[in-house]
Amino acid sequence: MSDTTTGSDAADAAVPATTPADLEAASARVDELRAEIERHRDAYYGETGGTVSDAEYDALERELRAIEDAHPTLRSQDSPTQTVGGRAETTLFAPVTHAERMLSLDNVFSEEELAEWAAKVERDAGRGRVRYLSELKIDGLAINLRYEHGVLVTAATRGDGVVGEDVTQNVLTMGTVPERLAGSGHPPLVEVRGEIFFPVAEFDELNARQLEVGERVFANPRNAAAGSLRQKEEGKSPARLELMHARIRRLRMLVHGIGAWPVRELERDAHVSAQSEVYGLLEAWGLPISTHFRVFDDIAEVAGFVRRQGADRAAVEHQIDGIVVKVDDLGLHEELGATSRAPRWATAYKYPPEEVNTTLLDIVVSVGRTGRATPFAVMEKVEVAGSEVRQATLHNQQVVKAKGVLIGDTVVLRKAGDVIPEVLGPVVELRTGKEHEFVMPTLCPECQTPLKPAKEGDIDLRCPNARSCPAQVRGRVEHVASRGALDIEGLGEVAAAALTQPLEPEDPPLETEAGLFELTMADLVPITVVVRDAETGMVKVDEKTGEAKRVTPFRRKRVLKRDGAFDPAEPWGDEASVPSKSAEVLLENLEKAKTQDLWRILVALSIRHVGPVAARALAGWFGSLDVIRAASREELAAVDGVGGIIADALLDWFEVDWHREIVARWEKAGVVTAVPGHPGPGAAAAAGGVLAGLAVVATGSLEGYTREGALEAIMAAGGKAGSSVSKKTHYVAAGPGAGSKLGKAEALGVRIIDAAEFRLLVEQGPDAIALPEADPVPDAAETAPDGGSAEDATAATAGAAEAATAEAKPKRARKRKAPAAAAAAPPTDVEAGTAVHAEPDGPAETP
C-alpha cells in the first residue's frame, strides 16, 4: 500500500494554489503521483500483477486528476490521466501497432456519478432518449485480433494502446479463436477487441499444478491469464512446456467490440448501427461473445442492472470489477468522440469490494529483497470474490495497530478491486478474551539480525544484513534473472530459493549473487528445498503429513534399464536420480546471460535508483563498468538522465567491499562488463558522434527496431533519446501508431522522419537526411502579369504560394534543414488529436 495520502479526501483537498509556494507544492505532488501511478501500471500490465488494490489505484488517479483540473498548467500529454495502460517493453515479443488505438475507460463509483455521466451524454448528444448497453467488466487481459479479409493476421496485447505485443501463436493455441472468420463479406481490415481470462473455477487447480512442478503460483486469475499468455517456448523443459500449453488451453476469451471499421461502413456494408447489433455480427463470424448484456432505455434501469449484477457476481465464470455502460447508438459514438485516453460514450461503474468474515490465526513477518520486514495476516481459509484466501499483507506494524486487530480475532476481509486480499479490521463484538496482541519482532526472522529503520522517522523496519540475509539474497537473485535485468529463463522463485536457502545441502550453493555464474551441475543436483508461499515467503506445509513440503528442482528419478539396473555412467545424484532438464536449461541460460548488454548488467546489480533509463545512459556514455566505477561524482552526475541522486547511489554502492566482489567474480566467470568497441567516456558526443548534441524521440513502430533498440541506437550515436516532444527536440522518428507525439511534433514544426530515414540518421548523421531549402517565393513585382496591377501580382503570388503549401503539406516539416545542435523549434504546444470511435479497453461481458 502506498504511504501517500489517497482517496476522496486527498482529491477534495486539491484546490487551486494562491501563492508560488502553493503551486510548487502542487507541482511536486503531481510528480509524485505520476511516478507512483506509472509504477503501479507497469506492475499491473506486466507479469507481477497489481501492487495495490484497484481502490487505492483509482484514488491516486482521482487525486491527480483533481490537481490537474485545479491547475491546468500542470497537465501534460504524458500524464497518466491522458494516457492508456502500460508500456509494451518486454524483449520476448515483437511489437505490433494497432490499426486503431485501444482506449481505456473513465470510471464512476456511485449511482449518483453514473447519473451525472448519463446527463452529460444526453446533453452533449442534443437529443431526447439515449439507449444504453450494459455488460460485465471482465478482469482479464485486453486483446486485439486483426483480421484482413476474414483471416487472422495478428493477435496483440493492448500495451500502451498504440503498440502491443504479438501473442498470435499463444492465442491460436487456446483453440477458441478462429483463424478464419465464418460467413462472407468481411471487410479488408477489421480489429476485434476482447478480453482473455482464466476461469475462476479452475484457478486453485492451476496453482496446485504449478507447485507440483516447482513453478510460482499466481495471486489471482487475472495474473494467471497474463502470465499464461505472455510466455514463450524457448528454453523450457518438456514438463514446463507441457504445463505452459495446458495453461494456455485453459484460457477463455470473449469479444466485445470492433475497431478500424468506420461507423459509416459498418452501417452500409454490415447493416449494423448499434453496439448491441455488433455482438450479433461477431457471433455470426464465429467469435466467442458473451450473452450477458442488456440494453436499457434510461439510466435508472442501468442502475438497477448494476445492483443486481453486484449481488450475483460471485456466480460468474470469471472475475469482474464493475459494469461497462456504453451508448448503444454507434452514430452517437462519433458525435460524442473521445478524450486522449477514453471515449465519452462509455464509462465503467466500479463495484465496492466484496467483504467476508474469517479468523485471524496468526501474524507472521517476511523479509523482502530490500530488507523490508512486512507482517502478513494468516487466516482461516475462506472464499472471497471467487477464489480462496488464506493470507493478506498488513504492510507494517503501524498499519496493524491502526486496524486494531488481535491474533485470534474474527476479521473482515475483502479483495480490494476483487483482486488483492485486504484485512479491514476486527469484529469486536465477537471477541472471547482469548485474543492477543501482535508484537513486531526485533530480530529478522530469516537471519536473526536486529531490525531497525533505514533512517530516523521511517515506519518500516528493515534487516540491515543485506549481504547474507537469505531472504534478501533470494530476492536479489530473482531480480538478476528478471526480464528487466538479465532475463534468465529457469531462475524463478523456486530456483532462487533452492540456490540460496536449500534444505540440503547444509551450505547453500549461493551465499550471495556473486557466485551465480560459477554454478556447475555438481552444485545443482544435490539440492532439496522446501516450498515457500509466493506472497509471504513462509514455508508451506503438506496437509497430509504436517511436514514442510519438499521438492528437488534440479534432479529427477533415473529410469531403469531393461535388466533392472541403473546406468552407472551418470556422475551426479544418488543411485536413483539424474539431473533434470531444469538444471540443464538454467546452466545454458546463465552462460547466455554473460554477454547481455552492459545496461542490463547495471540493472541486475540492484543499485538503488539505477533503472533501465539511467543504466542505458551510463552504459552509452562510459562504455564499461570499470570506467563507471572510476568516475567522479561530477562526471557521473553530468550524464544526461543520471544526475546527483543516482551519482551518489553509484558511489555508495561501489564503496561496499562485497558489492565490488560481485563484479569481480562475475567478470572472472566471463560476464562481459564493457560495450564492445566503445570509444571511451562520452567519446560519441565529445568526438563528434553523428548525433552529438541532438535530441531524438522515437515513437510508434519503427521497422527493424524494437522500442529498446531504437533508444540504444540514438544513444550509441551520441544523441539524447527523449521520452517526450518539446521545443528542444530535433527529430521525431515516427512509425505506425505514433499517436500524440506525432501531433505535437507537427505543431512544433519538429522534423519528422520515418524508419528508413531514422536508420540513416543514427548511422550517418543529419547530413544523410538533410533537405534542400524551399525555393524562394518570387518578388511580387517580378511576377506581375503584363499590364496587371501590383495587387494582381500579390494575389497571384499568394495563390501560387498557397498551392505550393497545399501540395507540400504532408511533408511541410521537411522544408527545414538538418538542425544543428543548438537549433530550437518554436515554443508552441497543442493538445493531441484523438480517434473518436476506438473501442475502449472495457472487457465486456454481462449476464
Swiss-Prot record:
Coiled-coil ranges (or none): none
Superkingdom classification of source: Bacteria
UniProt xrefs under SMART domains: LIGANc
One of the GO BP terms on file: DNA replication
Active site: K137
Positions bound to NAD(+): D54, A55, E56, Y57, D58, S104, L105, E135, R158, E195, K326, K350
Region annotated Disordered, chain positions: 1-23, 770-847
Keyword Nucleus on entry: no
CC cofactor: Mg(2+); Mn(2+)
CC per GO annotation: cytosol
PANTHER family: CHROMOSOME TRANSMISSION FIDELITY FACTOR 18, DNA LIGASE
NCBIfam families: dnlj (TIGR00575), PRK07956.1 (NF005932)
Name of this chain's protein: DNA ligase
Source species: Clavibacter sepedonicus (Clavibacter michiganensis subsp. sepedonicus)
